[in-house]
């Protein structure tokens, strides 16, 4: 699935938050990451306006990745092994994909062993390399 895992996101945020302003849009079921800006009230339009003024979007493949593309913003997106960026990604984004014999799996309802392997193989260091590349381009 498209979930990289809460612990992975925490590790990544902890590596970048001292040098960058990290804004985390939240909803009722969001797990808050301590030490970053997580406004309690941010509707979709406000989030899009903030993204328009941002240097980079980092997150899972999905709605805000498409918003970043529509705004022609740089992005680093986690695809895991769920769906190929060849199908739904944008070539000007840094798309992180777990390409193996079982990819893409398309599993939605549960974390399959393939997606669990993707979480383990796509490391924080891989994300950091993609972030550095995106910010240099």
Predicted stretch roles:
Residues 69-137:
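Nucleotide-sugar donor-binding patch of glycosyltransferase catalytic domains
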Residues 1-3, 118:
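A generic structural signal for short coil/turn motifs at secondary-structure boundaries
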